[in-house]
Amino acid sequence: MKNLCIKARAPSRIGIGGGGSDLPSFFDSYGGAVLNVAINLFSYTKMWRTETGKTHITSHDWEIERDIEDLGLEFELNKKDNVDMVRAVMKSASLSPKDGYEMVIHSMSPKNAGLAGSSALIVSLLGAMFNIAGKPMMNRDTFAKTAYDIERQMLKRPGGYQDQYAAVFGGFNFIEFGKEINIYPLRLEEDLVSEWHSSMMLFETPFPRKIFAHEVERKKDDEVKKGGKSIEYLKKIKEYAYGMRNSLVRGDVKNLGELLHLSWLEKKKLPGVSSNDIDLLYDTAKQNGAYGGKLCGAGGGGFLFVVCDIADRKKISNALAKKGARFVNFDYDFEGMVSWRTNL
């Protein structure tokens, strides 16, 4: 045990369709459905035991290097050195900082990218902590629900369910929400996987979110609870997700892209999602051959997802580069969360 090192990783995700309908405030009354795919922008955890009587956390992309000695939550979401996430996962895994741990965490997904990097990190942390504690790993469905409870209940960060499921299961997934949550992994043939990989593009926009993702989600949640027009928008977004699922399994790139476009027109009506600059960038992608696209995650900035024919990839990439957007290469991840043991 002295030289034992635990590592874990979990993938980020691209929410293809249905985003927002996975909010409990919506699906409890109207049902929800989302289509997403896990990608190889991973969140990593490395941890090992020490004899210091405290837990030391290092994360260069979070700009964190701190000791913690208790599990008290600070609830200061905007602090650069926020470690509530680590504390909440330790509490869920029944670990104590005073047991003595060294922990290094790293996320390949930039903060506020809309790719669910924070959810992936929670899943990665949870996998590593269960491993180091020698606890039997939960089944994947229970694992995803536990990660959801940590992020949404313990940390009180608003949002839906899909992020945790993508990070735990990996691959393409269609998830229905209602009285129960049912996840349907979509097992595509190798040719279809290649077709979709050549037809999907991801861009980092030059527009950072002016507000944090959890604030966008909170506004959306508040609108739904008020019973306003957001409910009608989300109903349409949910229905488009079913059509996108059917297009995905058929390999119908154009139809999925067109449904993605219609879904985006509804999503941008939600509070805090789009802006004039984002609309201009999206229109540029469409003018250069994109069938459709959307901002990833809650919106307000971050990453732009585009579906197109393979012949138009370069034209779209060049046009968006002139607008300051950076093409981000990615691959699909079909493993989901994995944790393993090695020596220090």
Can you annotate each of these PLM segments?
Residues 114-136, 168:
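DPxDG-like acidic metal-binding loop motif
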Residues 1-17, 21-28, 34-97, 132-133, ...:
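C-terminal nucleotide
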Residues 100-102:
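Residues at or immediately flanking beta-strands
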